[in-house]
């Protein structure tokens, strides 16, 4: 069967609007079905024996979320934070001020030893990014 789809409620219109989901800007008209579950942030998502804390992390897009697996000190962070960089904030639905808040108040409140797995690129840790990421150290 189909896998269940989860999406943050701030991106509710992205499913049906190619300009909001940015496919329209790339010459495509991609739409998708509504998700099976809407996220708000603050939930616990259980997959098999693994529990993930869902944290709302807007900036790159209004509905970015982190999936934090506290038991293993790892997190899936999408395009919020990369090794040495951050997610783009020049898209029409991005918000630089919300990204700044997410990085300063959400990401940097996480423990240094937390391994983060971005949407693409190598894994890193919060501590490594706190020490060396120019967007964390110097802002943007």
Q: What is the meaning of each model-derived region?
A:
Residues 13, 68, 120:
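Divalent metal-binding pocket/active-site signature
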Residues 17, 101, 128:
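Phosphate-coordinating loops and pocket residues in cytosolic domains that bind phosphorylated ligands
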